[in-house]
Regions:
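Conserved SAM-binding loop and adjacent beta-strand
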Residues: 1-9
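Nucleotide donor/acceptor-binding cores
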Residues: 18, 41, 87
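Conserved beta-strand signature within the Rossmann-like core of class I S-adenosyl-L-methionine
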Residues: 115-123
Length: 126
């Protein structure tokens, strides 16, 4: 596993019951690390690439089958998560607010549960 992604997930301080949203999940490596810390919580991971989502879902098949994870193909600005709320929303090396910053900010703010936090990582934490 990537030490950089381990450091990212450590910085998230994932709790067993957390509801976590990853934006731009790529191959699902960080998703695996998050799911290993969940017990009753759930990860929703999105990426605009169907190939990346397929790879991430394969990598995390046991977590998907256990109901700890779901993987969705979607652009951030088009993502419809209904009334779901998240304790932690994170992205690694993804520019969340460059295409339609106002819409992206509005969506992320709506998805955050009271007391929830947004994490953006471009370099290893530390």
């Amino acid at each position: 596993m990537s030490e950089r992604l381990r450091a990212v997930v450590d910085a998230l301080d994932v709790r067993p019951g957390d509801r976590v949203l990853e934006i731009g999940c790529g191959h699902g490596v960080a998703a695996t690390l998050v799911c290993e810390r969940l017990d009753g919580g759930r990860l929703t991971a999105v990426d605009r690439s169907p190939k990346m989502i397929a790879a991430a879902a394969r990598r995390n098949a046991t977590h998907v089958e256990a109901g700890r994870a779901e993987f969705l193909v979607a652009e951030l600005e088009e993502l419809d998560l209904g009334e779901r709320r998240f304790d932690k929303v994170f992205a690694v090396r993804v520019g969340l607010f460059h295409r339609d910053p106002d819409r992206a900010r509005s969506l992320v703010n709506r998805w955050l549960a009271p007391g929830g936090k947004l994490f953006e990582f471009f370099d290893p934490p530390g």
